[in-house]
Amino acid sequence: MIGPNRGRRVPIVIAAVLAVVAVGFGARGAVAAGPPVTLVAATTYDVLPDEHRIAVTVKVTATSTLKDTITRRFYVDRAYLAVPASATNLRISATSGKPSVTVSSRAAGAAVLLLRCGSQLGAGKSIPLTLTFDIADPGGAPDRALRISPSLVMFSAWGIGATGVSGSTVRVRLPAGYSASIGRGPLTGPVTESDGHLVYASAPLSTPGTFVADLAADRPGLLVDGRGSVSVGAQTVMLNIRAWPDDPDWRARVSDVLTRGLPALGSAIGVGWLIGPTLEVRETISGTAGEAGTGSAGGGSFDAAVGRLDIPYTADPTIILHGAAHAWFNAALVSDRWIAEGFAALATAEAGTALSIAVRSPAMTVEALGHSIPLNAWAVGGPDDDFGYAAALQLARNIEARAGITALRAAWADAAAGTFAYQPTDPLVEGSVDTQEQGAGPVDWRTLLDLIEGQSGRSFDGLWRAWVVRPSDAALLDARVDARALYAATVEAAAPWVLPRSVRDALRTWQFDTATVELQDLMSVIDQRESITRAAAAAGLSPPTALRHVFEGTAGVGAAAAEAVTEQAVIDVFSDVLAAEPTDPSLVITIGLLGTDSQADIVAAREAFAAGDLDATVSHAQAARAVWASAEDVGGRRIISGATLAFAVVVLLWLLVHRRRAPKRKIVRHAHRLEE
């Protein structure tokens, strides 16, 4: 349906002979079995926006269906024709005679005209008549069905002609520059005439008395800007309200509601202005019922890509507020229709209460309940729309009541910031990271459930099962319950360590099988961590931070498990080395250890382990082991060497002593005289 609802046209018998006259004598006249006269009309609706009227021209061909007899001749001189009740300035002309037209009666939104042909129409004869009248814009409420102005044309074009007689046609002529939409009909076109007029036309009509085409046309380039501003929280939003030049009432109405309503909506939602600094508001013929982010049928339509709000010229405060709420709840923030419509309606109602505006909210009816569906199955259009709008609002109210306004606003703040559920940040947990993980896209039914449960600490599983999910979705909720329980247990077991992002991403995308496998593997690593902690303490070692970094990082749980195995192996090596240290060394071993510093290697090994240098840990430990292992051999060799040395010293000393104690030999020197 285009524009305001049109009244249903009631078929009226529109051609009948008022008088059949017989002339002559003899046998009774042979009157046709059907109506004595047929009317075939070519009707042209010439739209004159500047004059606020439509000039209608009806070219009628009246044909007598009577037959003369030998003794009698028959003729007709008048007929009935139905036209819209709004027809004024009725005139009729013919090529001969003096035809006339008067209103015979009015009924069912139509005026029944009495056409006097101005001459006698003999049996089987035809006469062309031209009927003209005006359809004028009556003024009044903006949602009136008939509106003819330079900015907007809205009317219904009737088919005119005799019921049951085919061949009548309908044409609509619009001035250049208009963009038109056609409902019912059908009318084809437009065809551009030489003077620029746009022509829409019907095919020959088989039942003109029931034909009606709804036409709505505007001139997009005719909008006039009107600028202003409004504060939404801490932000200033520039308004550019673009209205038709001849519709100051719409501009004033929309400006008033938006100036007061945007701040109230921001407060109700709890999120600041999300789009660019300027909001363009455009007057249009009608609203659009569409995907997430558009208003309800006949409501405003928001385009997040360009920051434009289209509001129909008929809009009341409810439609204006609801359309403005989609500046938040649009495809940039949410991807599911029920979320956008339900929370937009909730914000509209709460803002209306704050502003003392009587808002019309979707209400659940018995008829709507007859079309109940899971909200995940709600598509655009169709018989379930009434249920969808009412159910979406009711669920939004239930969510707010269960979560509390503070938690709900926090969830929307997360959604607006692109903040994921399952954050690793927790200021009360030692070691928790400082920054939040962001980059999330528009919220769907799964993301919303995660965010709201995360902020409120309450379960919404029951509400989702009752209102949202299709039967095929229920298994996902079952898997989610189990995976979240395992996640909570793993988070608690891992503290103060933070689980790796990969497992949170799996939960965020509802890949519960993947998340479960990874969580189980992480639990195994946590068990390894505890074993490492106990073994390290027993060995006098301080566990390094390497395992935590790998555990929390992006290398994967396999890398963490490998690191844990390696650390445990190094601890085992170190423990074995400690076990090899002589506890009650013999004299030989004690002598072998003289001059060594195996404890320096042990200290160095402990320091290397704490620093995460596992190779150095093993190297220093093995060095200490080597000292202890060789101590007995070294001691033995040292004893032998010492004994040998001692024996040599003893011998040397004996020799020295013996030499000193031996008697001195007397030396006799003889002098010899030399003979000369």
Task: Report the location of each language-model feature.
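C-terminal region of N-terminal signal peptides and the immediate post-cleavage residues
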Residues: 22-36, 631-638, 658-664
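Lumenal/extracellular ectodomains and adaptor appendage modules
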Residues: 26-235, 564, 605
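Acidic/His/Gly-enriched intrinsically disordered linker/tail segments
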Residues: 314-315, 335-441, 488-489
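Beta/coil-rich, acidic/histidine-enriched accessory regions frequently appended to metallopeptidases
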Residues: 259, 385-386, 421-623, 642-647, ...
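Bacterial N-terminal signal peptides
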Residues: 13-24
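Selective detector of the "anchor" transmembrane alpha-helix that sits immediately C-terminal
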Residues: 636-660
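Juxtacatalytic substrate-recognition/specificity segment
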Residues: 229-336
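Cytoplasmic C-terminal tails of single-pass
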Residues: 663-676
